[in-house]
Amino acid sequence: MSEAKTLLVGGLWKNNSALVQLLGLCPLLAVTSTATNALGLGLATTLVLTCTNSAISLSRRWVPAEIRIPIYVMIIAAVVSCVQMLINAYAYGLYQSLGIFIPLIVTNCIVVGRAEAVASKSSVPLSALDGMAIGLGATSVMVVLGSIREIIGNGTIFNGADQLLGPWAKAMHIQVVHFDSPMLLAMLPPGAFIGLGMLLAAKYLIDNKMKQRATLKAESQAQGLPEGKTGAL
């Protein structure tokens, strides 16, 4: 498997920052009350990761090892400030919804961790790819969790998408279920923890199933039997 493919698979699934490393849980749990908020913060985080990884990789030869972390944080803070101004200018409703969690991307362990683990040691293309993969992996978890909570809590999905993507995105708003009494627990912090726990359990089950299939396939190939069968009687 090529290095680029390894980074993609790792960021999106095997080393997913939200479901495997459990990093950045504060914004993940707080902002995912709706799919729109989750998508907005996820895209902002992905943009920050891609830009900061590229900038840090580009300047890694001129950064003294003794002060690299403060310099990384300054680069991250500069990129986050630009992203914050862009959201404020073009998606003000989303900017108000996300609030303090946009500038808090600066302190997100995911961003600093990838800067130290990958960007400071890899080429610019690989660093940018890693940032994009990690960001999209986190975004996918945010959107799935936000969608689950929004459907259970309000019966809708992508309500207010026009605040993020423009007037055309009003068509993305879908009334999935009509509730006489919405389940507010899903929109509150306990609902976020329960939803995340369900996603963690689902990933664990899928990974176990994939390992079992891989083991069975390897045993079948070793014994010269058709795939899915073993020599056991």
Curated annotation (Swiss-Prot):
InterPro entries: NqrDE/RnfAE, RnfE. GO terms for biological process: electron transport chain. The keyword Cell inner membrane applies. Pfam families: Rnf-Nqr. Keywords: Cell inner membrane, Cell membrane, Electron transport, Membrane, Translocase, Transmembrane, Transmembrane helix, Transport. Part of a membrane-bound complex that couples electron transfer with translocation of ions across the membrane. Its EC number is 7.-.-.-. It is found in: Cell inner membrane. The keyword Cytoplasm does not apply. It is an enzyme of class 7 (translocase). Belongs to the NqrDE/RnfAE family. The gene is rnfE. GO terms for cellular component: plasma membrane. This is Ion-translocating oxidoreductase complex subunit E.
